């Protein structure tokens, strides 16, 4: 069963250094971009330069950097879905040394009254995907680190936000009435497709 997939007692057969060589240390922070519009805006408006590339047989993902105040921040356009988004973060970490990843994107609301007109800051993610079970011990939810730090940031700037559980799923086509109701009963206010896996891989590394 998938809940038996967490194995820290033996070494992985495939390692990133086999493909990319030694880990690099180029930047500390990296933005994970889902929106092609935002991605293209950043490339157009900032003096960006390519610092790395995630390689894949169906197309490579360039990783860019831009200067912001006295920092250099990396960013890239991420693939969608838990396995790809989380795996890409692991590769970007290896290629650039980035250890602080800022990820934001869209989602589906499960509670319009709570979320309408607000930024959603997840506190926990239901693990309705597969990747997280390889990187974290099996349990229904995974805690989202730094959610309270983000809430303080939003509060100081008087930005509308709400905190709550979210549901990470691998298939929006199987968000059935019964499953939606069950997640809502557990306190989920939104549904998306990446967070549980991304948090698990970040915690692991």
Segments (PLM) and residue ranges:
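Glycine-rich beta-alpha junction loops
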Residues: 35, 108, 167-171, 197, ...
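Short alpha-helix boundary/capping motifs
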Residues: 82, 144, 173, 191-192
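A generic structural signal for alpha->beta connector loops
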Residues: 70-72, 98, 158-163, 187
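Short, conserved beta-strand edge motifs with alternating hydrophobic and charged residues
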Residues: 103, 122, 162-169, 192
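A structural motif corresponding to the C-terminal end of an alpha-helix
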Residues: 69, 153-161, 198, 205
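A C-terminal functional module that forms or caps the active site or interfaces directly
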Residues: 178-182, 189-205
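Metabolite-binding pocket within alpha/beta catalytic cores that recognizes anionic/polar moieties
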Residues: 1-144, 148-149, 204
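Active-site rim beta-loop-alpha module in soluble metabolic enzymes
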Residues: 140-185
């Amino acid at each position: 069963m998938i809940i038996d997939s967490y194995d820290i007692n033996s070494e992985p057969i495939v390692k990133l250094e086999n493909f990319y060589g030694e880990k690099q240390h180029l930047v500390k922070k990296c933005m994970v971009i889902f929106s092609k519009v935002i991605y293209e805006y950043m490339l157009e408006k900032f003096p960006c330069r390519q610092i790395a590339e995630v390689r894949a047989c169906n197309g490579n993902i360039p990783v860019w950097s831009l200067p912001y105040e006295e920092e250099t921040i990396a960013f890239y356009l991420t693939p969608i879905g838990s396995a790809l988004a989380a795996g890409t973060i692991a590769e970007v970490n290896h290629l650039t040394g980035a250890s602080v990843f800022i990820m934001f994107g869209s989602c589906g609301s499960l509670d319009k009254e709570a979320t309408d007109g607000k930024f959603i800051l997840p506190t926990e993610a239901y693990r309705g995907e597969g990747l997280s079970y390889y990187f974290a011990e099996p349990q229904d939810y995974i805690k989202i680190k730094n959610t309270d730090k983000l809430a303080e940031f939003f509060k100081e700037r008087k930005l509308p936000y709400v905190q709550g559980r979210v549901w990470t799923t691998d298939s929006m086509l199987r968000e059935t009435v019964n499953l939606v109701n069950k997640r809502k009963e557990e306190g989920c206010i939104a549904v998306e497709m990446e967070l549980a896996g991304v948090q698990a891989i970040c915690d692991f590394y």
